[in-house]
């Protein structure tokens, strides 16, 4: 399966308006994963922080997905807001990992500015409040199974911007 370069990072890192593979989709018959707890990203979404986000340069206020869970063949609307503690300059990176079951589909480092520019944001990203509303098309042919996605974002100086993860399982429609 070929992964587009919009939905996944947009879903995982929408406050930074990033974009990447659409692997976080599940069927409507599923029960959303339990994501309660201290590391839950606020809002209607499956996102969790990788660790305590208090030292991150990006403080995410909220991420809402519609529909949640995302549905194959339907547009996914992402609304997100957050505050950056300082300007995010060129040279910032995203380490993206996507696994499908036990198979690692993606393990690559990407330039953050290249990704933000794909969705209409200028780089460097200014210090202060950021608001994003983005719609991405979800392909109808999403293989059933368990997807685990991790996006670790760092500044050019190596400071943590954010680190997010999501686990989504969807089943074959019967």
Curated annotation (Swiss-Prot):
Gene Ontology CC terms: cytoplasmic vesicle; extracellular region; Golgi apparatus
Subcellular location: Cytoplasm; Cytoplasmic vesicle; Golgi apparatus; Secreted
Entry keyword set: Cytoplasm, Cytoplasmic vesicle, Golgi apparatus, Lipid transport, Secreted, Signal, Transport
Transmembrane segments: none
Keyword Secreted in record: yes
Residue ranges listed under propeptide: 20-36
Chain's role: Catalyzes the intermembrane transfer of phosphatidylglycerol and phosphatidylinositol.
Assigned protein family: Belongs to the NPC2 family.
Protein name, entry field: Phosphatidylglycerol/phosphatidylinositol transfer protein
